[in-house]
Amino acid sequence: MMEEIDRFQVPTAHSEMQPLDPAAASISDGDCDAREGESVAMNYKPSPLQVKLEKQRELARKGSLKNGSMGSPVNQQPKKNNVMARTRLVVPNKGYSSLDQSPDEKPLVALDTDSDDDFDMSRYSSSGYSSAEQINQDLNIQLLKDGYRLDEIPDDEDLDLIPPKSVNPTCMCCQATSSTACHIQ
């Protein structure tokens, strides 16, 4: 007849428990029956960690009884008042304008523009892609329009990365100029 024992509770003494001392085994069954109701807690001193855990469990039980919730908090469903009301959620739709925006405030981005600087898509065919010649012409027009003539102007010689040749020839073995003598030993 085993009772369900909580993990953190101190086990009680039962008649099924056998003493380790053989001299104590000679105790009569009447003595065991008298001790059956007693707790081993009288001889057992719990560790400070066990005492702390037991206090936390008791506080949790009292808190759950105060709130009227039974069972573990994980199994509880969320309360409906935790969800924001639908009327408080502002979901922008197409054509949405903020109600609290005053008429003197300008939006950050103007979406409707009729400027001539817009890219003209009518020049390109709708079949997927344009020919390479048409793209090349468009690039040249854009470069000329922006003031760049990169293909027509040759590179500046001052920008070459190859250093210019020196006026005085040098000897590779001792780095001496023509005015000094170079002696190989």
From Swiss-Prot:
Work out whether the entry's keyword set contains Lyase. Answer: no
Post-translational modification Phosphothreonine, affected residues: T113
| Sorted UniProt keywords | Acetylation, Phosphoprotein
Q: Which residues carry this modification: Phosphoserine?
A: S47, S72, S102, S115, S122
Q: Does the keyword Phosphoprotein apply?
A: yes
Q: Where is the composition biased (Basic and acidic residues)?
A: 52-61
Give the region (Disordered) as residue ranges. Answer: 1-131
Compositional bias (Low complexity) at which positions? 122-131
Pfam assignment, any one: FAM219A
Query: Polar residues: which segments have biased composition?
Result: 66-80
Q: Which residues carry this modification: N-acetylmethionine?
A: M1
Could you tell me which cysteines form disulfide bridges? none
Task: Give the family per the record.
Answer: Belongs to the FAM219 family.
What is the protein's given name?
Protein FAM219A
Native source organism of the sequence: Homo sapiens
